[in-house]
Amino acid sequence: MKQFEFGAGLMMSISLMSFSLGNPPLPLTAKTASAAESQTVLPPLLQRELFFGDPEITGAQLSPDGQFLAFQKPLDGVINVWVKGIDEPMEAARPVTADAESPIMIYFWSADGRYILYGQDKGGNENFHIYAVEAKSLGGTSPVTRDLTPVEGITARIYSVPKRTPNHIIIGLNERNPQFHDVYRLDLTTGERTLLIQNDENIALWTTDLDGNVRIGYRQSLEGGHEILAVQKDGLTPVYTCRIEETCVPIRFHKDGQRVYLISNRDGNLIQLKLLNLESQQSQVVEVDPENQVDFGGAVFSQATDELIVTSYVGDRIRIYPQNDKIAADLAFLKQQLPDVDIVLQSLTIDDRFALIGTRSDVNPGSTYLFDRSTQTLEKLYDDRPELPREHLATMQPIRYTARDGLEIPAYLTLPQGVDPVNLPVIVMPHGGPWGRDMWGYRPFTQFLANRGYAVLQPNFRGSTGYGKAFLNAGNNEWGTGAMQ
């Protein structure tokens, strides 16, 4: 990895008081003598709406049977859900929701593909309800949306969408006690709810097996850490615990129904993928970062067999590890067809034949493709922001620098196009969260600043997630002072 020496050609400027975004410090057109003499051409000044406006299309998902494609797109200026037949052009899509006030940010298909389900609150009150709309009834002039949780003052959660009972989902409602969610089975056709578990044990999260049976509870322990509990006939039994400075979270049941996948760093520095046997309470490591650099990033499971097929890690960029030969061949094909981008598997059909593939990069806000795994063919569906000229965007480079106490800090540096990287004004832009690390890729505010002549440094300072337990906890008692500052 290339090392950057900030003193050699890049002047760091921490204070932003002298910066004026309305009056950029660098020339922004090629009509000056200095620009004309430059070896490179300055990019045009791009309007902020191109960076910060709603994407034209985003968030596509295949129906389980592969016959339809849903995605998010503005309707009268508000993000809603649209659906089209898989063989239809994107222009033939019809809206199936018509929220005129708040954008629909999260949605998904029911297990049989009959309904689009989504969560929505009113006016930002954070009382999210679950709504359903007939996804394939596209002939009407106005979609009919049903509130499946019509209770005032509650926040609904969706815990599971089991394939084996496609007309039912498992949800949580805090109707009885605003602090905790009881667990219900919800009939998508009638809206009828059946109580499964009354939450009297301060459980924050419930996990079901692949058949929709509630098997795991997750809560904070009295010592400030967390504990995973098995749901049994006579109550809840702790089966795995971690301390306050550690991580342990269940993510999905194994197809054998006896073991559960979880992520944990209880026995090491990096978060690992593990399998926990609920009966023996013994766990085994499934995978840890092959490069021994970062925490476990994510997992993808087959829709057809429920087997683990892909793992991923976020280092300087996303790294993907196929778990069988067929997936390895698919990934090799995709990398050949889609070079120089990070590849994300967005959704799979129930038979694993079709996959939605998302691509991202520092200069690509997002593109989505339909991949037929049986024929090894790839069809581009859309770009998220087609009007944003990628040739005028600035590249983001992973770098490392050494803090005053010798700790190596990972960061990303974005330099404006068309000028030498010497004596540039620099905006240091720490991530929020406050722990959630920055990643390589398109960032609208970063590109907006770079287009106006600023270099942007995004440090993943000590206390950032993703780089192991030691790096995360190195930020304890250092906020705003000490070595972090």
Regions found by a protein language model. Give the residues of each.
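Bacterial N-terminal signal peptides
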Residues: A8-S20
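A short helix->beta-strand "capping" segment at the edge of beta-propeller domains
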Residues: E37-I57, M90-A93, A328-V341
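A short beta-strand motif characteristic of beta-propeller blades
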Residues: L46-F51, A93-T97, V144-P150, E192-I197, ...
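Beta-strand-rich domains and repeat architectures in extracellular enzymes and scaffolds
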Residues: E49-W82, A355-L356
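A flexible loop/linker signature enriched in serine peptidases of the S9 family
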Residues: D54, Q72-V81, A98-P103, Y115-A132, ...
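Blade-terminus and WD-like Trp-Asp/Gly-His loop motifs, strongest in beta-propeller folds
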Residues: A60-F68, I106-Y115, Y159-H168, W206-N213, ...
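Short loop/turn segments that connect beta-strands within beta-propeller blades
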Residues: G85-P89, A135-L138, D187-G191, V231-D234, ...
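Serine-hydrolase catalytic core recognition
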Residues: V344-Q485
